[in-house]
Amino acid sequence: IPGVGFGTFANEGATGXTYLKVDYIDLFLVHWPIAAEKAIGVSNWTIEGLEKENILPEAYSPLGIESNFKXGGYTLAQVLIAXGLSIQLTDXXYXAVNK
């Protein structure tokens, strides 16, 4: 993947084929607002900036929900790597993960 720096992707008519030889780019993570792709990452935008541009964020923060796992007897680290280990989550613990 070629390096894409400030200003190199916002050119008029820029497409995924220009840089990656694909039909389109499904997700292009950036740290500044551009409208050249179907979806952008917004890791350092403010809520006010997102609202101004009518962008609805989707958040993923498993480390922020520790209280959901206290009753199950597992640490957050155990739950996060459970897919690669033999830990079996109960239905109640699995439901807590999906809150």
UniProtKB/Swiss-Prot annotation:
Q: Which reaction does it catalyse?
A: glycerol + NADP(+) = D-glyceraldehyde + NADPH + H(+)
Q: Which UniProt keywords apply?
A: NADP, Oxidoreductase
A molecular function annotated in GO for this UniProt entry is: glycerol dehydrogenase (NADP+) activity
Q: Which InterPro entries match?
A: NADP_OxRdtase_dom_sf (IPR036812)
Q: Which domain of life is it from?
A: Eukaryota
Family the UniProt entry places it in: Belongs to the aldo/keto reductase family.
What is the protein name stated in its UniProt record? NADP(+)-dependent glycerol dehydrogenase
| Species the sequence originates in | Aspergillus niger
